[in-house]
Design a protein with these regions (language model features):
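P-loop NTPase Walker
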Residues: 1-82
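Accessory N-terminal region flanking or inserted into the helicase ATPase core
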Residues: 1-7, 15-16, 33, 105-190, ...
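Conserved helicase motor core of SF1/SF2 NTP-dependent helicases
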Residues: 8-11, 39-42, 195-242
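Short, well-ordered alpha-helices that flank and scaffold nucleotide-derived cofactor binding pockets
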Residues: 19-26, 49-53, 175-182, 203-210, ...
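A generic structural signal for alpha->beta connector loops
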Residues: 31, 60-63, 185, 212, ...
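Short, hinge-like loop/turn segments at secondary-structure boundaries
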Residues: 53, 82-84, 232-236
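Conserved P-loop NTPase motor core of helicases/translocases
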Residues: 62, 70-99, 174-179
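Conserved phosphoryl-transfer catalytic core
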Residues: 86-110, 212-224, 240-242
Length: 242
């Protein structure tokens, strides 16, 4: 069963989800059978804090599945921070390829990628949109400073760099999660801040909810704050018709 909860900011969508969490816990659903995934770490943490305080639970042990999607993939794949692409790795990659990279990192708060290098930004955005890189390039406007062939070569070189160093980025984690044969089965699944999810994240959400008894998805169908990072609000809106 899937329930969609829509509304603009401040209309109580998250409060509705939190009240539902309370109800299911009161009804005897075990905390570890509840998945609560949000776009931002802040929202997931607030949900876990409320449930832990109200029911005397330990966040780490009793509520391990109140997370962001990239954090859940990280956890399920048994990753460590040392295996993740970091600022120094991107800097080394830039030096190796002869391109300037002052800033390049994924946010631990919401999983978005930020870089001062437009090539890396385009490579990342194509990945979260699940688009062929060159097709995405061709669909863009006002990127005259980006050379098509250079973009493709840098993308291939970045793949080799990560393979050689056995490193992953947040997009790789979700793609690897999608390839897993199994995932946790939840009695109840909550998805908050749904309007900000990318198509790549929606594929992960669909895999998780395919094994959930009940699913509640909340978001604002009129606004996506993270469109610049690949948020696919149209996919969210289309859920109402399914």
């Amino acid at each position: 069963m899937k329930t969609i909860i829509l509304g603009p900011p401040g209309t109580g969508k998250t409060t509705t989800l939190l009240n539902l969490v309370d109800e299911f816990l009161k009804d005897g659903i075990r905390p570890r059978q509840i998945g609560y995934f949000s776009f931002t770490k802040k929202a997931a943490t607030e949900a876990a804090d409320r449930a832990a305080d109200k029911f005397g639970l330990d966040k780490e042990n009793d509520l391990p599945f109140f997370r962001t999607l990239h954090s859940y993939a990280f956890n399920q794949l048994g990753m460590t921070k040392e295996k993740m692409m970091g600022r120094d790795d991107y800097k080394e990659f830039g030096e190796k390829c002869g391109i300037p990279i002052k800033t390049a990192k994924f946010s631990n708060e919401d999983g978005t990628f930020n870089s001062d290098n437009e090539y890396l930004t385009i490579i990342n955005t194509a990945a979260v949109k699940r688009m062929d890189l060159l097709e995405y390039y061709d669909s863009r406007k006002n990127i005259l400073d980006i050379e098509r062939n250079t973009l493709f070569l840098l993308s291939e070189e970045l793949k080799r760099f990560k393979e050689e160093k056995k490193l992953k980025d947040f997009n790789d984690l979700i793609e690897d999660f999608l390839l897993k044969e199994t995932s946790n089965k939840f009695e109840v699944l909550f998805i908050d801040e749904a309007q900000d999810l990318s198509l790549l994240q929606w594929e992960m959400v669909r895999k998780i909810w395919s094994r959930a008894e009940k699913t509640y998805i909340a978001g604002d169908d009129d606004q996506a704050i993270f469109k610049w990072a690949g948020a696919d609000v149209d996919h969210f809106i289309a859920l109402k018709e399914e």
